[in-house]
Amino acid sequence: LFDPPDSXPXY
């Protein structure tokens, strides 16, 4: 399962 981009820190 992959977390959505908003879940993690962005660049």
Swiss-Prot record:
Modification(s) after translation: N-glycosylated.
Keywords annotated in UniProt: Blood coagulation cascade activating toxin, Calcium, Disulfide bond, Glycoprotein, Hemostasis impairing toxin, Metal-binding, Secreted, Toxin
Protein location: Secreted
Domain of life of the organism encoding this protein: Eukaryota
Domain C-type lectin: 10-11
Keyword Glycoprotein: yes
GO cellular component, one term: extracellular region
Keyword Zinc recorded: no
Tissue: Expressed by the venom gland.
Function: Regulatory subunit of the blood coagulation factor X-activating enzyme. Activates coagulation factor X (F10) in a calcium-dependent manner by cleaving the Arg-Ile bond at position 234. Weakly hydrolyzes insulin B chain, fibrinogen and some components of the extracellular matrix in vitro, but does not activate prothrombin or plasminogen.
Family: Belongs to the snaclec family.
Extra remark beyond the main annotation: Calcium is required for ligand binding.
Protein name: Snaclec factor X-activator 1 light chain 2
Native species: Vipera ammodytes ammodytes (Western sand viper)
Source taxonomy: Eukaryota, Metazoa, Chordata, Craniata, Vertebrata
Gene from which the chain derives: LC2
